[in-house]
Amino acid sequence: MTHISTWIDEYHKGSRFGLNGEILIKQNSKYQEIIVIENEYYGRALMLDGCWMTSFKDDKYYHECLVHPALSSIDEKSNVLIIGGGDGGTARECVKYSQISKIDLVEIDEEVIKISKKFLKEIGGEAWN
């Protein structure tokens, strides 16, 4: 596959975020358009239907802030259900808790998981093992 360097833009309520880089994969699944782009500053980034999801650069800030406040607020941490999270980052953070014996990740779009495992495996880390 030939990789294409281009600009990808996300638009939201009168604002625009542009990202220049090499498109590693652009695929339409049954549910959405999935893009992984390699950017000089952010590293690899995942976009779904034109919306920024995560990147190597900001992954830890998003997933750590999503998981740790929630899990720190409960005493019994044995089973976790993740709805969405096909990039694996939320599950990766949950794996850090030894009290958790079971993590169920439910993602409607199996292509997001397949693409994340191939192009963004560092984000899922230990969760994919």
Regions found by a protein language model. Name each.
Residues 1-45:
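N-terminal auxiliary segments of SAM/dcSAM-dependent transferases
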Residues 2-8, 54-129:
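The AdoMet/dcAdoMet-binding core of the Class I SAM-like
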